[in-house]
Amino acid sequence: MSDRKEQPNTRVSPQGMIEVSPRAIATIAAQAVCRSYGVVGMAPANLRDSVVQVLRQEDQHRGIEVHINKDSIAVDLYVVLEYGTRISEVAQQVIATVSYALNKSLGMPVSTVNVHVQGIRTE
């Protein structure tokens, strides 16, 4: 997840306040990415750390940047795909799956989901 200081998604109702952190949003996105066919791992967003990580519980936020705008959410995903899959179809499926999961869980519109293919795994 991005190291940027981002404001949590906050909603105020007569019963109280609901605050969802960018890390929680990244967790929802990570779970959706894990369910996507053809994705075998996440890659760090920065180029300093070029080691690709296979999706594991402790690394699930790696390769996910969450940007919370006033009335919507934008997400950047840095993924590694399986060799032999059609990149455009996998990316479109990831976009649809993540958008649906975030919208369903948060009830807030998702403005963009950007998929950055950082590598292809051949094994």
Task: Set out the residue ranges of the language-model regions.
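C-terminal structural segments of small proteins and small subunits
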Residues: A96-T112
